[in-house]
Amino acid sequence: MIDLDLRAYFDTVRHHLLLEKVARRINDDEVMRLLKLMLTTSGKQGVPQGGVISPLLSNLYLTEVDRMLERAKETTRNGKYTYVEYARFADDLVVLIDAHPRNAWLLGAVNKRLREEFAKLQVEINEEKSRIVDLDRAESFGFLGFDFRRLRSMERQVWRAHYTPKMKKRTALLRKLKDVFRRYQSQPVDRVVQLINPVLRGWVNYFAVGHSSECFSFIKDWVEKKIRRHMGRARNRRGFGWKRWSRRWLYEELQLFKGYRVRRASAPKALPA
């Protein structure tokens, strides 16, 4: 599997190349004029991050890469089986190559063509963070905030994709929540709950697929302890107040976020090598 990292992608998008791509699809001078004005706010190159249209433009800029990968996929197809698969959103790209020895040439060929396409678009590959991943050796790769790996199910002994939130994403969430508890340590607990609930809801809703249950349990327990410690300090009490404040009280009376349910996605089976 090819896991590519693009160096400062959003800051290096070439405006003239992007506008050429947009012009092939939109025949409206006013729209093109407004788009040029929007792009120039970020300087001579790059796409302004945070804008409503920025994800669309970032995806559009790399459509030639998608076309190349689609051609590779169809050229090497054998009936219903494909030996090249890929997934991309903006600058996050992973390419999976069939691991059978007879397809070993594909890895080098696709890797070479990818680099050629990125060079045409003047997009630089971050060699330090790009790598070839061997899923047969239980190695993992990251995509859109998740860690993916290939595991065999214990019940049916079938290979399946296993994906969980990346550790750095969990760490970033806890750091953000810690900051709320620190800055509002003298405030009533219901105020703290009002502030952390939207943060938890947004994060959990995004990661509520795959195999996030263990991660969610850790976060849920961590938040409960922080809430208990907050209330204990307000009353000059030590400990976490397990007897004073039941779990039911935290969720029913305080209305602490409790929607940690994981949606089971129907992930495709991973074919054996």
Label the model's feature ranges.
Residues 222-226, 231-273:
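Extended C-terminal regions of large enzymes
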